[in-house]
Amino acid sequence: MKRMFSVFLLITVWLLVTPFLQAQSHVDKVLKDEITSDLKENILSFWERYSVDSSGGFYGSLGRDGAPIADTPKGGVLNARILWTFSTAYRMYGDTAYRKLADRAQRYFIDHFIDSQYGGVYWLIKADGTPLDTNKQTYGCSYAIYGLSEHFRATGNNESLQRAIELYRIMESKVKDPVNDGYIESFTREWGTPQKLGYDGDGIAAKTMNTHIHVLEAYTALYKVWKDNGLRKRLAKVIDLITTKLYNPQTHHLISYCDSNWNNLDDIDSYGHDIETSWLLTEAAETLGNPEVIGKCRKVALELADASLKEGINPMGAMMYERHKDKIRRDASWWCQAETVVGCINAWQLTGEQSYLESAVRTWNFIKSRMIDKEHGEWFRTVLEDGTPRYKEPKASMWNCPYHNSRMGFEIVARLK
């Protein structure tokens, strides 16, 4: 009798669960298919078609329609992100057109952005490839390591690995704070103290959350291809700094700006950075492979994701930009939306909770309806609170790049197999 009851119970559970799993599988497939189509046919194709500068490298700025904006300086961050994007595209899809663009980006970056005399990375070069702003920003150096590490991973080009290692060693010898640890924000070309902090000269902080999360992703990418014990220790330390010095366990938000002693300098909750960090921390911990660190990072990751989703999502399903003191910046930036989709899928995979998958779909639906430029391709940079895009913003600039939204595509393809 007990056996018959057990069989009956199993059949009942199967009948109840199977439709749910089938529906969930359908949602997964639709999400993956739609995002893959956007990645290959809208984002990557736009950059293939418009970004290549016939005089060398890639244009510094493109208008909404892809037309180059003449004589625009070329940013190190933009070019490192282009390098990362097409290296990843080649690794995932094996398309030789992606390989060609990845190699072009690698060669141009090494030849024009890396300072052969003092080490590190120039912040800006002129349209003709000569140095313009030679200050060293830790943010830019981190992206160089990220892009070069991915190029080696995708192509096996040893020069890329060696350059990434050189930059890592510069970070440890010149940038790391020898007293309080962490990474100082800005330097002169010769690694002296700059007159002004930050990449815009308006910075208030010796150390920032934004730079540290990109040191995290850079060191994670490098450790995937170079299992150096010293790097392993530093990656573990960066994880520790983010989860102890830059994370507020009371608010479940990251601390944006600190002095050299890690004292908080402002009152900001950056929703996009919080949910981006949630999955970057998870990836870093899993790459490190320490079970204790993985457990700690998963806990923090879910707290970051929950807080940003609770406080930062607007009625249209878009992630708003940030809260600064008593004011909320309510516009929706392209990068925040991309990171929200990945962060939600990561949280769903960690917990199995359907609400995270639903949040990912909701934000993707906002991207489809409001953020993708159906006339000229790629995404709008900003959508205002009323749902109107800022039509005149450039598609490429120092900050506009194919990295956040293409990475969303790569992550979804890899995660929803």
Residue ranges, per PLM feature:
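Bacterial Sec-dependent N-terminal signal peptides
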Residues: M1-H26
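Glycan-recognition and catalytic cores of secretory/periplasmic carbohydrate-active enzymes
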Residues: Q24-K417
